[in-house]
Amino acid sequence: MDVILLQRIKNLGKLGDKVSVKAGYGRNFLIPQGKAVAATEANTAAFEARRAELEKQESEVLSSAQARADQLNEVNIVITAKAGDEGKLFGSIGTRDIADALTNAGLAVDRAEVRLPNGALRHTGEFNIAIQLHHDVVAEVLVTIVSE
């Protein structure tokens, strides 16, 4: 089944690409979610008429993500947690804890945007945490974990 993508989809394509996908993936996921339309002649013509509008929306999303990244790059967060004598935490600091700390600091961040490639943080210290705001925009936040 051929579809025209209405937004960027990881490992598939970007806005306006005509791609071939399995029929079930197109019918049951891409089209109902509004991420693609079937590649008929009528839909192709309609997409070309809306292309400028869709590209403008995508550029606005990118610019707002870049503005948020500029704010986040200047932020240092301090999280207090119970820890043992050697700095090992009783528990861990995960994506939700970091997102909540950033939200309390006045910057709205969803926990899905926080990237912890090595898993939850289990020691006191300073950590550079990546915040993925857009597929092209990543911000770095310095998180300091101190014991109570």
UniProtKB/Swiss-Prot annotation:
GO terms for cellular component: ribonucleoprotein complex; ribosome. One of its GO terms (biological process) is translation. GO terms for molecular function: rRNA binding; structural constituent of ribosome. InterPro entries: Ribosomal_bL9, Ribosomal_bL9/RNase_H1_N, Ribosomal_bL9_bac/chp, Ribosomal_bL9_C, Ribosomal_bL9_C_sf, Ribosomal_bL9_N, Ribosomal_bL9_N_sf. Signal peptide: none annotated. SUPFAM superfamilies: L9 N-domain-like (SSF55658), Ribosomal protein L9 C-domain (SSF55653). Pfam families: Ribosomal_L9_C, Ribosomal_L9_N. Keywords: Ribonucleoprotein, Ribosomal protein, RNA-binding, rRNA-binding. HAMAP family: Ribosomal_bL9 (MF_00503). Binds to the 23S rRNA. Belongs to the bacterial ribosomal protein bL9 family. This is Large ribosomal subunit protein bL9. It comes from Acinetobacter baylyi (strain ATCC 33305 / BD413 / ADP1). The gene is rplI.
